[in-house]
Amino acid sequence: MSTYTRPVMLLLCGLLLLTLAIAVLNTLVPLWLAQANLPTWQVGMVSSSYFTGNLVGTLFTGYLIKRIGFNHSYYLASLIFAAGCVGLGVMVGFWSWMSWRFIAGIGCAMIWVVVESALMCSGTSHNRGRLLAAYMMVYYMGTFLGQLLVSKVSGELLHVLPWVTGMILAGILPLLFTRIVNQQTQARHSSSISAMLKLRQARLGVNGCIISGIVLGSLYGLMPLYLKHQGMANASIGFWMAVLVSAGILGQWPMGRLADKFGRLLVLRVQVFVVILGSIAMLTQAAMAPALFILGAAGFTLYPVAMAWACEKVEHHQLVAMNQALLLSYTVGSLLGPSFAAMLMQNYSDNLLFIMIASVSFIYLLMLLRNAGQTPNPVAHI
């Protein structure tokens, strides 16, 4: 049976369009608020409302999938995201935009839960690494193309909203031509997010998603600031960030393939060790290109491998709840990491960004080197 079936390919096509829209809005919303002369703290609050919506959307999407299935959950999530987009054109203001970005955050989180859960339920323990790698490649490619679009088209609010909304609605179309079966509805027992978080045999996967959130959130949010403080121009900062993201895209498929072939535990150990090496290399500032490349290739691929690890440890009908738990863990890490790293950078030194990344990675490596409880035959083997 092919790994990349027709439903999987159509799902990824829809995700690409939605990710383009997400990337464009995440870039332009802070700029629109700044043009409206809102103070910096209000711009930050609007951004926080989006991430708060992510948390809320993550919590209830599993119940929705169980009730109405993957396809209808995907349609609803896309419509909620589109509503959050259209609402931005109603009135530019702090409270209005904070509400609409909260709604958009819910829709985006629902999309991620639906897509990730559908991919995991479509795969087996032998190919989930490749499926999640394809998912991350599409996600990062959409993010990259979204940034490219921002630089090529008019950034005016009322010029952007119509075609971005159209792109969101177009993202629904591929799923109209296929049906993704939700086998969870046939299960006798439902699983909760809290139960998945407490599952001892999957704890390394959950911890891996938290660490991945810390690493990626810190790199995404604070690497441009670090480079700016090194005296680089905006063009140079853009180049080095492109190197970082490109490495993450290029590393997805090989890491997924290696994880499926040699086991997720071994690959996780190697990934985390390489993240530590890349962080140390950044501190030396001797060879930034290879240091950033290996940091991106290992750091950006940690999340899908950790997800695949955790999903090996649960029954098939528990996959959606487990995915919610993993996405929630990643979101928490991506919120906490940049906040803590920014505080360290402001009060002490910019180099503490990489010291913090290396430190949390080292702690996770110690966990991985202990008895991981890996079983020769994964539970979720179908």
Swiss-Prot record:
PROSITE patterns: MFS (PS50850). It is a multi-pass membrane protein. It comes from the Bacteria. It holds the Pfam family MFS_1. InterPro entries: MFS, MFS_dom, MFS_trans_sf, MFS_YcaD, MFS_YcaD-like. Keywords: Cell inner membrane, Cell membrane, Membrane, Transmembrane, Transmembrane helix, Transport. GO terms for molecular function: transmembrane transporter activity. The keyword Cell inner membrane applies. The keyword Transmembrane helix applies. The chain crosses the membrane at residues 8-28, 45-65, 75-95, 102-122, 131-151, 157-177, 204-224, 231-251, 270-290, 291-311, 325-345, 349-369. It is found in: Cell inner membrane. One of its GO terms (cellular component) is plasma membrane. Belongs to the major facilitator superfamily. YcaD (TC 2.A.1.26) family. This is Uncharacterized MFS-type transporter YcaD. It comes from Salmonella paratyphi B (strain ATCC BAA-1250 / SPB7). The lineage of its organism: Bacteria, Pseudomonadati, Pseudomonadota, Gammaproteobacteria, Enterobacterales.
